[in-house]
Swiss-Prot record:
Ranges for domain SAM-dependent MTase C5-type: 75-435
NCBIfam families assigned to the protein according to its UniProt record, in alphabetical order: dcm (TIGR00675), excise (TIGR01764)
Catalytic reaction annotation: a 2'-deoxycytidine in DNA + S-adenosyl-L-methionine = a 5-methyl-2'-deoxycytidine in DNA + S-adenosyl-L-homocysteine + H(+)
GO biological process, one term: negative regulation of gene expression via chromosomal CpG island methylation
Pfam families: DNA_methylase, HTH_17
UniProt-listed InterPro entries: C5-Methyltransferase, C5_DNA_meth_AS, C5_MeTfrase, C5_meth_CS, HTH_17, SAM-dependent_MTases_sf, SinI_DNA-bd
EC number: 2.1.1.37
Enzyme active site: 154
Enzyme kind, highest EC tier: transferase
An example molecular function term from Gene Ontology annotations: DNA (cytosine-5-)-methyltransferase activity
Name of this chain's protein: Type II methyltransferase M.SinI
PROSITE patterns (alphabetical): C5_MTASE_1, C5_MTASE_2, SAM_MT_C5
Organism lineage string: Bacteria, Pseudomonadati, Pseudomonadota, Gammaproteobacteria, Enterobacterales
Protein's UniProt keywords contain DNA-binding: yes
Source organism per UniProt: Salmonella infantis
Length: 461
C-alpha cells in the first residue's frame, strides 16, 4: 500500500516500472487520476495502486492503450539514436512497427513525444540494461525482435589526441549499441553512418606526428580500423555483414546525400545491396533523379521559417543565379567575397552556393547559412527554410519538428531521408521472406569507389 495520497510522476514511474515520459502521457490521457499544479503533475496514489495490480508492463500498456494500434503481425523494431525518426519512418513505411526509440537531444525527444506519445522513449543507451530496454518496449519473454536500427556516432573511436583507445569500452556508445544489439539478437541489425566510418582509425594520430622521419602508423592508427573492428565483433556473433555507401538520390530522395548502411543478418546469409528506384540519367531503365523543382515549388504560398544571411553576403547573392556559387562572381569580387578562405585548397563549392532547380538538393546540413556550406534558395535572398528541409528529407506533412529554429534545422539536417530508410526496410523484408532481390551490376551507388563490403573485403564478409 502506498503511504501518501498524492505522489509525483517520478514516484509513480518507479512503482509502475514505466518511464516518467510514459507516466506523463498517461496523466494527459486520463489513464491515471492526476492533476497539474503549475507545470507539475500530481497523481492520486489510489489510481497507481489499481495499475500495480496489472502483472506486467506489457499488460499495463495494453490496458491503457499505450501500444500503437497497428496489426500485431508486423515485424518489430527497436530504434536507437533516433533523432527526428527519419530512418524509423522509412522502415515503418516498408512494413515494420517501431516499439521503442532512444534519444538524448531534448528537441529531438520532444519531436518523438509529440508525434509518438504512446511509444516507449528512453535516453542515453548506456543507462539501460538489455532487460530494461525489452521491458520498456513491452517485449515479453520468448518474443523476438526482428530489427534493431540506429546511427551511433563514430567520433568516440577517434577523438584526436585524447582518447585511450578502447580501454574504457563502457564509455563508448557505439560499443554499447553493438553490445545491446548482439545481446538481444534480433533477426537483423542496421547501422547507419557517415562516409567517414569507412576510413576512421581506431586511434587518431595528429598530423604533425606523421611523415618522414617519424614512426610509422600502428595498426590501430590505420584507416578503416573502426570498420574492421565492428565487423569482427558482429561476425563473431554469427551474423553476416554487408554494406555500401548509398546516395539517397538513387532511392527517390530529392537530395545528394551519401550514407553508409550496414545490414547484418542473424541467419548468416549475406543481404544483397539495396535496390535503387532512380538513377541520375535514367540508367537501368529507372526514373531519373527527383529534382528540387519537383519538390519545393508547391511550398510558395506558405510561411517559411528560416535563418538570415548576413547583409554583406547578400551583396554577392544578388549577383548569383540558381546553381551558381562563388566562382561565378566577377573575378575582382571572388577574393573579396571569400576573404582568407579564398586561399584554402579544394573546390570550396559550398561557399556562396545557390542550389539548382533541376538537380537534387545538395546534402542538407545542420545550418544552411554557415559560410562553407551555404544552401541558398535558387531565386530568393535567403537560405532554404525548415519547411523546404522537411519536404526534401521526405517527412510527412503532419510530422511535427519541435524546438527552436536552429533545433529544427539540426534535427532535419541530421536525419536519414525517408526514401533511404524505406529502401533499407524493403530489402530486409524481402530477405526475411525469401523474396528475390534484384541486382544491378555495376550500378553507381555513390560518387566514390571501393565503398562496399565486396570491394573492401571480397567474399569473406
Amino acid at each position: 500500500m502506498i503511504m501518501n495520497d498524492i505522489i509525483t510522476v517520478t514516484e509513480a514511474a518507479q512503482l509502475l516500472e514505466l518511464t516518467p515520459q510514459r507516466v506523463r502521457t498517461m496523466c494527459k490521457q486520463g489513464s491515471i487520476d492526476a492533476y497539474q499544479s503549475g507545470r507539475t503533475w500530481l497523481i492520486k496514489s489510489s489510481s497507481v495502486e489499481k495499475l500495480m495490480l496489472v502483472n506486467s508492463l506489457s499488460d499495463a500498456q495494453n490496458s491503457y492503450s499505450m501500444l500503437a494500434s497497428e496489426p500485431k503481425n508486423k515485424p518489430k523494431a527497436l530504434s536507437f539514436f533516433s533523432g527526428a525518426m527519419g530512418l524509423d519512418l522509412g522502415i515503418e513505411q516498408a512494413g515494420f512497427e517501431t516499439l521503442l526509440a532512444s534519444e538524448i537531444d531534448k528537441a529531438a525527444r520532444d519531436t518523438i513525444l509529440s508525434n509518438r506519445p504512446n511509444m516507449a522513449l528512453i535516453g542515453d543507451i548506456r543507462d539501460y540494461t538489455t532487460e530494461d530496454i525489452l521491458k520498456l518496449a513491452g517485449v515479453s519473454s520468448g518474443n523476438e525482435i526482428d530489427l534493431i536500427m540506429g546511427g551511433p556516432p563514430c567520433q568516440a573511436f577517434s577523438t584526436a589526441g585524447k582518447r585511450l583507445g578502447l580501454e574504457d569500452e563502457r564509455g563508448n556508445v557505439f560499443i554499447k549499441y553493438l553490445d545491446v544489439a548482439l545481446d538481444i539478437r534480433p533477426k537483423y541489425i542496421v547501422i547507419e553512418n557517415v562516409r567517414g566510418l569507412l576510413s576512421a582509425p581506431m586511434k587518431h594520430r595528429p598530423h604533425n606526428e606523421r611523415g618522414e622521419g617519424l614512426p610509422p602508423l600502428k595498426s590501430e592508427e590505420q584507416p578503416g580500423g573502426v570498420l574492421h573492428y565492428i565487423i569482427r565483433i558482429i561476425k563473431s556473433a554469427g551474423y553476416s555483414v554487408s554494406f555500401n555507401l548509398y546516395n539517397s538520390a538513387n532511392f527517390g530522395v530529392p537530395q545528394i546525400r551519401e550514407r553508409v548502411i550496414i545490414i547484418c543478418s542473424r541467419d548468416g546469409s549475406r543481404v544483397p545491396f539495396l535496390q535503387p528506384t532512380h538513377s541520375e540519367k535514367g540508367e537501368y531503365g529507372l526514373p531519373k533523379w527527383i529534382t528540387l523543382r519537383e519538390t519545393i515549388t508547391n511550398l510558395k504560398n506558405i510561411t517559411h521559417e528560416h535563418v538570415l544571411f548576413p547583409e554583406k553576403r547578400l551583396k554577392y547573392y544578388r549577383l548569383l543565379k540558381e546553381g551558381q556559387y562563388w566562382k561565378h562572381l566577377p573575378e575582382d569580387l571572388q577574393k573579396e567575397a571569400l576573404g582568407k578562405s579564398f586561399f584554402l585548397g579544394g573546390g570550396k563549392t559550398g561557399f556562396l552556393r545557390r542550389v539548382a532547380w533541376d538537380r537534387p538538393s545538395p546534402t542538407l546540413v545542420t545550418h544552411p547559412a554557415m559560410p562553407a556550406t551555404d544552401l541558398a534558395h535558387p531565386d530568393e535572398l535567403r537560405p532554404l527554410s525548415v519547411q523546404e528541409y522537411k519536404v526534401i528529407q521526405q517527412f510527412p506533412e503532419e510530422w511535427v519538428i519541435k524546438g527552436k529554429l536552429l533545433d529544427k534545422y539540426r534535427q532535419l539536417g541530421n536525419a536519414v531521408p525517408i526514401g533511404l530508410g524505406l529502401a533499407v526496410g524493403k530489402n530486409i523484408l524481402d530477405h526475411m521472406n525469401g523474396r528475390k532481390i534484384e541486382s544491378f551490376p555495376n550500378f553507381r551507388y555513390s560518387r566514390y569507389k571501393n565503398t562496399s563490403d565486396l570491394d573492401i573485403f571480397g567474399e569473406l564478409v
